[in-house]
Amino acid sequence: MNLVLPKKQTGVWNGSNKTMGDSFMDIWIGIIGLSLGSFLNTCIYRIPRHQSIIWPRSYCTSCGRQIRSIDLVPFFSWIFLHGHCYYCRAPISCRYAVIEVLTSLTSVIVYKNENGSAAFFAGILLIGFLISIAFIDYDWHLIFDKVLLSFAFCGGIVQMFLGQTSYLNMFLGFLTGGGCLLLFMILSHGGMGGGDVKFAAVLGIWFGWQDILLILWIAFVLGGLVGILLLATGKKTRKDFVPFGPFLAFAAFFIYLYGNIILSVYQAIAYG
């Protein structure tokens, strides 16, 4: 199976031949991931508010004062400040630290998955967009076109330099991802948002038509299970909206790691 993102599945969990150099690279990639997570926090906060993600520099959302350079160290600044602004002592959500750690861990996983190849940078782009889109959709129930356009453009660039699939597969992935959710949106009379449709279409560009089907299946199953749990616990009612973007993002990262394995097992069972 040819995918847009080349995968080296054996690199994810194989630590039997780990060297000191490998450990150093893991730490270094983890630090880079923390910094990327800090940038993603900026994107997640500012993009829905139509603010520049570059200027001005980071500031406290309570008092508006610019954050000191020493307090911009990802994750550790939140720990040292005990989760409060240095100036006004307003609480800072632990989610900032969570996103930084999440990005750091997934960056290391991507590095292992790609065995340090150039495809690592494509994987970093992927998780950056997935995390940003997932949290923005969770907060605002919106997936912004400008983010999706950038995501699609990067998918095309990745395919140009690293891809192992045809442009036809990318086009079919685009049609399959967007078409399936568009059909669901029509049949469910608005049960799916337009942003989700476009998100699935762009994922199809990155993954191709076979993997986007797996992504949609996992996202629907996971979304259904979470929905049942929320209904059972009284956290949501049948009339409440649950954003689908986070489920698509999680499913996409899962298939990025294990898509080849899943399809290989399926083909072995189906065709002997």
Q: Which role does the model predict for each range below?
A:
Residues D26-S52:
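N-terminal signal-anchor transmembrane alpha helix
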